[in-house]
From Swiss-Prot:
Pfam families: Band_7 (PF01145). Residues 31-288 are mitochondrial intermembrane. GO terms for cellular component: mitochondrial inner membrane; mitochondrion; plant-type vacuole. The chain crosses the membrane at residues 11-30. This is Prohibitin-1, mitochondrial. PANTHER family: PROHIBITIN, PROHIBITIN-2. SMART domains: PHB (SM00244). Residues 1-10 are mitochondrial matrix. Signal peptide: none annotated. Component of a prohibitin multimeric complex in mitochondrial membranes. The lineage of its organism: Eukaryota, Viridiplantae, Streptophyta, Embryophyta, Tracheophyta.
């Protein structure tokens, strides 16, 4: 048996070489494809290492290297995103208020390793609902229901101030906080509508009174003008009888002009035109 020789396979060395090259090439291709990762615009990455855990370095946008299997990137979106919350709270005068809040939130990029250690990737769902609801209840309780309407901007500023401080404790930044809607109970809403109707009625009554006063002043001024006109006409008649003759001539001319423009032909005597030329005193007073 010891003298038995195994025949050599033709081309065995070439196959072995090709096999080695294939294995090495496959490992190289695997390493090349799994040792690179991309960080898109508006994102940041941190690295989890199986030996040391989360590294403190934050990786910016671009392509980066990692050790396959030993390292794994965790990518965060650091752009501001809207978050909507609705909460029902009691005001200082015990009115139930449903308030809607919109916040623009983003993680602090330089604190991403700490955020991952304490909150994980879904940090917003773990932090924002609790601190927003707590802040809304605390702030709304300081105002009456009517003040929430008239001082809405001040309420929004106070909510923003408290929320910004609370969120910073969790390494979360708030770029904007705004109240989107305020909804009150049926009784309070009915009271507000009744108050608005009363205010409108009061304004309408005020307008009517002012209009009546204006009409009264206009009537007085008109009466004074007519009295003055009558006085002047009386003085003119007393001073010169020809004034009456002039008025008669003007009246007759207006009547004649109206008849001339009419489609029907009418013949009137001078007496019908209020114009009695024979009875008129056309002589001018010598004094004039």
């Amino acid at each position: 048996m010891n003298n038995v020789k195994v025949p050599k396979i033709p081309g065995g060395g070439a196959i072995s070489t090709l096999l080695k090259v294939g294995i090495i090439g496959g490992l190289g291709l695997y390493g090349a494809t799994h040792s690179l990762y991309n960080v898109e615009g508006g994102h940041r990455a941190i690295m989890f290492n199986r030996l040391v855990g989360i590294k403190d370095k934050v990786y910016p946008e671009g392509t980066h290297l990692m050790i396959p299997w030993f390292e794994r990137p965790v990518i965060y979106d650091v752009r501001a995103r809207p978050y909507l919350v609705e909460s029902t709270s009691g005001s200082r005068d015990l009115q139930m208020v449903k308030i809607g809040l919109r916040v623009l939130t983003r993680p602090m990029a330089d604190q991403l390793p700490e955020i991952y250690r304490s909150l994980g990737e879904n940090y917003s769902e773990r932090v924002l609902p609790s601190i927003i609801n707590e802040t809304l209840k605390a702030v709304v309780a300081q105002y009456n229901a009517s003040q929430l309407i008239t001082q809405r901007e001040a309420v929004s500023r106070e909510i923003r101030k408290i929320l910004t401080e609370r969120a910073a404790n969790f390494n979360v930044a708030l770029d904007d906080v705004s109240i989107t809607n305020l909804t009150f109970g049926k009784e309070f809403t009915a009271a507000i509508e009744a108050k608005q109707v009363a205010a409108q009625e009061a304004e309408r009554a005020k307008f009517i009174v002012e209009k009546a006063e204006q009409d009264k002043r206009s009537a007085v001024i008109r009466a004074q003008g007519e009295a003055k006109s009558a006085q002047l006409i009386g003085q003119a008649i007393a001073n010169n009888q020809a004034f009456i003759t002039l008025r008669k001539i003007e009246a007759a001319r207006e009547i004649a002009q109206t008849i001339a423009n009419s489609a029907n032909k009418v013949y009137l005597s001078s007496d019908d035109l209020l114009l009695n030329l024979q009875g008129m005193n056309l002589d001018v007073d010598a004094k004039n």
